[in-house]
């Protein structure tokens, strides 16, 4: 959604049981990376199950602008003919990433390690998001910021070096985006690039580097072996390959929690990625008493996937440890909704990273809970939600701040509250889950345009 579009309010009404089976959309993290590795490889990459949301399509457009041939061959089926490491061209015009934080940050790593100059921009939400943590290591690797908005934000122009400088970099926070940007820049560095993280973050970039033929090693490190040291040998020849994109656990979270909180529901989610660095929400919900059955486990696109059977459940409050945050950072809004229906108090610890997402997600979630009569508190970077085991009042209007996950989380809430819940704008849902409404309607949900009457 562009920052000058008219808001499109959407309202969710209390629904009867949700039933049926669905395949959630392709994983957004892997879809971005499949496009980017298609650009950086030699030869042809074919992708199946690509998430065709606005975020990923912006990355596809950037990949094409940097010199790759990009062709859509059918629903979710794409063909990329890459230019190889060092073979990119300066794009004509600005790389407009819309709302895509992941796409823009990963591509800064790509541009920051290659002999190319590009200008990055985005919508009103992306223009507020900090890029300095991405830029800091890339500048150490030889990139140069030609111009930037205040505070290292977009719009900014980045010029990469002829060859990147290999570095050893310790991440200031657990962030797959920073780690990936350094590794992507390191692809054009002679020698070894090393990234050290105190807590393991999503490892999709490391897995995809291996899939395309790079020499990358990952070893446990740090206190208790919870950290990781990732070592990449630079200037490989990446070879185009086939990528099957598994279903996105962050998108699956919305119908999954809906099935838990709408009485009498039973829903099957097919082909959901079960990467242990992405399943913190499922772990937490099971601790809360959720009836989630995992079956038919298999491998797809270098990742483990499984089908999930989810039944309506009585949930109880739990304490969610801060170290689980990297494995579920995008799922806290929908976890807060589940917690609103649970008996007792749920405490989500260490949510600082939520303050620098598409919105200040911590503040946005708290405001949404308040608007719908849910007891909650913020202590430092911890969110505390208190439920009574029954449905909250609902009846509120939630300010989404152009954040797709806030919009979907509170629409799910409205399917089981006593009164309908309205979100002030549902247009940006297309960034990650374009089929959200038809998918939910097919299960029996009632979601309508406009504010509640």
Curated annotation (Swiss-Prot):
Residues the record lists as binding phosphoenolpyruvate: 28, 101, 129, 177, 361, 405
Catalytic activity reported: 3-phosphoshikimate + phosphoenolpyruvate = 5-O-(1-carboxyvinyl)-3-phosphoshikimate + phosphate
Renumbered residue ranges of the record's region Disordered: 1-25
Pathway: Metabolic intermediate biosynthesis; chorismate biosynthesis; chorismate from D-erythrose 4-phosphate and phosphoenolpyruvate: step 6/7
Superkingdom in the source lineage: Bacteria
Keywords annotated in UniProt: Amino-acid biosynthesis, Aromatic amino acid biosynthesis, Cytoplasm, Transferase
GO molecular function, one term: 3-phosphoshikimate 1-carboxyvinyltransferase activity
Annotated EC: 2.5.1.19
Record's subunit section: Monomer.
HAMAP family referenced in this protein's UniProt entry, alphabetically: EPSP_synth
The protein, known as: 3-phosphoshikimate 1-carboxyvinyltransferase
Species whose genome carries this gene: Methylorubrum populi (strain ATCC BAA-705 / NCIMB 13946 / BJ001)
Gene: aroA
């Amino acid at each position: 959604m562009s920052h000058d579009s008219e808001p499109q309010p959407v309202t969710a009404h209390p629904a009867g049981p949700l039933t049926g089976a669905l395949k959630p959309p392709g994983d957004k993290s892997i879809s971005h990376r499949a496009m980017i590795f298609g650009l950086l490889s030699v030869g042809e990459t074919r992708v199946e199950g690509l998430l065709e949301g606005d975020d990923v399509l912006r990355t596809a457009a950037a990949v094409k602008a940097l010199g790759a041939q990009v062709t859509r061959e059918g629903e979710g089926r794409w063909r990329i003919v890459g230019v190889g490491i060092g073979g990119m061209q300066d794009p004509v015009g600005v790389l407009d990433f819309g709302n895509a934080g992941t796409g823009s940050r990963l591509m800064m790593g790509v541009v920051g390690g290659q002999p190319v100059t590009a200008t990055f921009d985005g919508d009103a939400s992306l223009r507020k998001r900090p890029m300095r943590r991405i830029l800091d290591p890339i500048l150490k690797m030889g990139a140069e910021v030609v111009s930037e908005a205040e505070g290292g934000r977009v719009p900014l122009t980045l010029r990469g070096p002829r060859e990147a400088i290999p570095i050893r970099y310790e991440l200031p926070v657990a962030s797959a985006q920073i780690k990936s940007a350094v590794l992507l820049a390191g692809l054009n560095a002679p020698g070894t690039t090393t990234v050290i993280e105190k807590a393991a973050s999503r490892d999709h970039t490391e897995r995809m580097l291996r899939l395309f033929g790079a020499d990358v090693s990952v070893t446990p490190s740090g206190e208790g072996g919870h950290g990781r040291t990732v070592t990449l040998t630079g200037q490989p020849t990446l070879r185009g390959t086939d990528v099957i994109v598994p279903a996105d656990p962050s998108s699956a979270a919305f119908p999954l929690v809906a099935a838990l909180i709408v009485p009498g529901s039973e829903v099957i989610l097919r082909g959901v990625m079960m990467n242990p660095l992405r399943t913190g929400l499922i772990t937490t919900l099971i601790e809360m008493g959720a009836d989630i059955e995992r079956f038919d486990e298999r491998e797809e696109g270098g990742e483990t996937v499984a089908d999930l059977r989810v039944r309506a459940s009585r949930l109880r409050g739990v304490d969610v440890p801060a170290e689980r945050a990297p494995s579920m950072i995008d799922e806290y809004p929908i976890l807060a909704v589940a917690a609103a229906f649970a008996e007792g108090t749920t405490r989500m610890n260490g949510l600082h990273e939520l303050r620098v997402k598409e919105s200040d997600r911590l503040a946005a979630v708290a405001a949404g809970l308040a608007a719908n009569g849910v007891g909650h508190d913020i202590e430092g970077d911890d969110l505390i939600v208190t439920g009574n085991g029954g449905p909250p009042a609902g009846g509120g209007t939630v300010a989404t701040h152009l954040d797709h996950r806030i919009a979907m989380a509170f629409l799910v809430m409205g399917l089981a509250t006593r009164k309908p819940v309205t979100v002030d704008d549902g247009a940006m849902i297309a960034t990650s889950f374009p089929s959200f409404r038809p998918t939910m309607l097919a299960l029996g949900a009632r979601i309508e345009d406009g504010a509640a009457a």
